[in-house]
From Swiss-Prot:
InterPro entries listed in its UniProt record: Ribosomal_bL17 (IPR000456), Ribosomal_bL17_CS (IPR047859), Ribosomal_bL17_sf (IPR036373)
PROSITE patterns, per the entry: RIBOSOMAL_L17
Sequence similarity: Belongs to the bacterial ribosomal protein bL17 family.
Disulfide-linked positions: none
Keyword RNA-binding: no
Ranges annotated as spanning the membrane: none
Name recorded for this polypeptide: Large ribosomal subunit protein bL17
Extent of the signal sequence: none
GO CC aspect terms: cytosolic large ribosomal subunit
Organism of origin: Buchnera aphidicola subsp. Acyrthosiphon pisum (strain APS)
Keywords: Ribonucleoprotein, Ribosomal protein
Example of a GO biological process term: translation
Quaternary structure (record): Part of the 50S ribosomal subunit. Contacts protein L32.
């Protein structure tokens, strides 16, 4: 029986699942929006939101905790300098999951996961207006 077991297995071993979720978290913090399957997005949200909560206040101990989960100095710096202060007044709900149809190959439900208060890049719109 599956009582009191949290999280999704996603048909992977535990080490593969942890590596995949860490890589997806790094991609989300780098690009601030990624497209993935709905179940992966829901599982990624469980990983990302506590990391953003830790990055609100910049201390050495919190940097070490975040670095132990992310393992990339550039992303940790971006979290504490840019994203953490941006979410300082927000108590939770840092990510948004938007459903975007089904994948053409196997009809898996797809979704965008994005950071809520991200700065949208308007350079493409400026070029199109000219």
């Amino acid at each position: 029986m599956r009582h009191r077991k949290s999280g999704r297995q996603l048909n992977r071993s535990s080490t593969h699942l942890n590596s995949m979720l860490k890589n997806m978290a790094c991609s989300l913090f780098t690009h601030e929006v990624i497209k993935t399957t709905l179940s992966k997005a829901k599982e990624l949200r469980r990983i990302v939101e506590p990391i953003i909560t830790l990055s609100k206040i910049d201390t050495v101990s919190r940097r070490r905790l975040v670095f132990s989960r992310i393992r990339d100095n550039a992303i940790v710096a971006k979290l504490f300098k840019k994203l953490g202060p941006c979410f300082f007044s927000r108590l939770g709900g840092y990510t948004r999951i938007l459903k975007c149809g089904f994948r053409s190959g196997d009809k898996a439900p797809m979704a965008y996961i994005e950071l809520v208060d991200r700065v949208k890049n308007n350079k493409k719109n400026e070029i199109l207006k000219k």
